[in-house]
């Protein structure tokens, strides 16, 4: 839910979601419709994505336990087959849920801006440049991403206070 929304907005949506559904799983999510999901703060696209994901799980076409045993690119390929889930979402799932050590979401705007600030660049690096810049951090790019996100958060808080 944090994609393209502020962390504060994501937290507020999550709190409203917790009040609207007692226990969330694929089947309970499928009892809701787009309108109810939008009522807890999800955009239309995110509501439809959540319903698509729930349907895949409910029908047995997506098994999160199996994802744990797949290679990173296999997980990305599996998740991005679901309408509304792109590479960034799959990469963040690999980082957060599967704790994979070498994921670098090169197209992440916060990472790009964090790297721009850390390296004192006059421009936001491209996705290709981000891959090249992160090459020395292999096989631990996830840790570099987490540190860069932390830097970005501190950087944006600092700018907001100025």
Give the label of every model feature segment.
Residues 87-162:
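C-terminal accessory module of base-excision DNA glycosylases/AP lyases that mediates lesion recognition
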Residues 5-83, 136:
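Alpha-helical ds-nucleic-acid-binding substructure associated with the helix-hairpin-helix region
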């Amino acid at each position: 839910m944090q994609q393209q929304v502020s962390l504060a907005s994501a937290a507020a949506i999550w709190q409203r979601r917790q009040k609207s559904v007692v226990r969330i799983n694929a089947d309970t999510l499928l009892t809701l419709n787009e309108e109810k999901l939008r009522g807890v703060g999800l955009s239309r696209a995110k509501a439809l994505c959540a319903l698509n994901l729930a349907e895949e799980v409910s029908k047995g076409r997506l098994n999160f336990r199996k994802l744990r045993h797949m290679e990173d690119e296999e997980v990305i390929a599996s998740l991005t087959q679901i309408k509304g889930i792109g590479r960034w979402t799959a990469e963040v799932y690999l980082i957060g849920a599967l704790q994979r050590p070498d994921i670098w979401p090169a197209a992440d705007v916060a990472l790009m801006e964090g790297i721009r600030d850390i390296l004192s660049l006059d421009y936001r690096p491209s996705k290709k440049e981000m891959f090249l810049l992160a090459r020395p951090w292999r096989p631990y790019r996830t840790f570099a991403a987490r540190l860069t996100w932390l830097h970005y958060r501190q950087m944006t808080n600092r700018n907001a206070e100025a």
